[in-house]
From Swiss-Prot:
InterPro entries: GPCR_Rhodpsn (IPR000276), GPCR_Rhodpsn_7TM (IPR017452), Olfact_rcpt (IPR000725). One of its GO terms (cellular component) is plasma membrane. This is Olfactory receptor 7D4. The gene is OR7D4. Disulfide bonds join C97-C189. GO terms for molecular function: G protein-coupled receptor activity; olfactory receptor activity. It holds the Pfam family 7tm_4. Its main location: membrane. Residues 1-25, 76-99, 161-197, 259-271 are extracellular. It comes from Homo sapiens. It is a multi-pass membrane protein. PROSITE patterns: G_PROTEIN_RECEP_F1_1, G_PROTEIN_RECEP_F1_2. The chain crosses the membrane at residues 26-46, 55-75, 100-120, 140-160, 198-217, 238-258, 272-292. Residues 47-54, 121-139, 218-237, 293-312 are cytoplasmic. Gene3D superfamilies: Rhodopsin 7-helix transmembrane proteins.
Length: 312
């Protein structure tokens, strides 16, 4: 098929998770349920943090931002997939695909940055408790979040502008249920060397550096706890870090699983199936991890729900 520049009328074909017609209603019901649970759970976290003065601290400020990003992240892919299943159409427009790639990179990158910032917050709280309020002041907290958005915005924009220069064949098939950046580059007809370089740099920035920051923070935390004589103090410190460690392990564990799945099997079907874990399961489980393991969040949610019940 002759390669041509895609226009706004051109489209890609997202092959999805399965071609079996009997599975489509099951997939629709499953993913709709997961989407609603994710949005509701993360909205409750945001409402609990914003409405309860006890949670107006740096840790919960970052948590509410993480919940907002998770809602945006899952909303980038799932609604389109649900519409496609219901309409029995695999089409996605060229601009729709680029928009999906842009926001996927942005929100996935923000997840990594926020997890690193939250690890730094725990490091300051445990290793420098007397200076915590001075170091983690509202100005610094806001600056950390804004700087993360700024960096992610420009990296995502550069990647999309470079992708717009590529040529594709009309009706190109993408073996995924969303426009995953690497899969889109694989089906391009023109040279993608520069795009791959930018993608690798972005992966290093969004993956390696945040992970290094998280590892450094927790190495300092462990070192500080080793010198702590109070068992109660150690337990309290571990309990404040437990939820964050679970979320970090889930996020990077599922991401690594997707990478290994695609590297070992070379199967697009298994890769897209594994992608469900980090694209949908991780954002869905985050609110449960933080609410079930955190007494402050559980208390705030109970007060929020009791106020809602008391309203006429």
């Amino acid at each position: 098929m002759e390669a041509e520049n895609l226009t706004e009328l051109s489209k890609f074909l997202l092959l999805g998770l399965s071609d079996d017609p009997e599975l489509q209603p099951v997939l629709f019901g499953l993913f709709l349920s997961m989407y609603l649970v994710t949005v509701l759970g993360n909205l409750l976290i945001i409402l609990a943090v914003s409405s309860d003065s006890h949670l107006h601290t740096p840790m919960y400020f970052f948590l509410s931002n993480l919940s907002f990003v998770d809602i945006c992240f899952i909303s980038t892919t799932v609604p389109k997939m649900l519409v496609s299943i219901q309409a029995r159409s695999k089409d996605i427009s060229y601009m729709g695909c680029l928009t999906q790639v842009y926001f996927l990179m942005m929100f996935a990158g923000m997840d990594t940055f926020l997890l690193a910032v939250m690890a730094y917050d725990r490091f300051v709280a445990i290793c420098h408790p007397l200076h915590y309020t001075v170091i983690m002041n509202p100005c610094l907290c806001g600056l950390l979040v804004l700087a993360s958005w700024f960096i992610i915005f420009w990296f995502s924009l550069v990647h999309i502008l470079l992708m717009k220069r590529l040529t594709f064949s009309t009706g190109t098939e993408i073996p995924h249920f969303f426009c995953e950046p690497a899969q889109v580059l694989k089906v391009a007809c023109s040279n993608t060397l520069l795009n791959n370089i930018v993608l690798y740099v972005a992966t290093a920035l969004l993956g390696v550096f945040p992970v290094a920051g998280i590892l450094f923070s927790y190495s300092q935390i462990v070192s500080s706890l080793m010198g702590m004589s109070s068992t109660k103090g150690k337990y309290k410190a571990f309990s404040t870090c437990g939820s964050h460690l679970c979320v970090v392990s889930l996020f990077y564990g599922t991401g690594l699983g997707v990478y290994l799945s695609s590297a070992v099997t070379h199967s697009s079907q298994s890769s897209s199936t594994a992608s469900v874990m980090y694209a949908m399961v991780t954002p869905m489980l985050n609110p449960f991890i933080y609410s079930l393991r955190n007494k402050d969040v559980k208390g705030a949610l109970e007060r929020l729900l009791s106020r809602a019940d008391s309203c006429p």
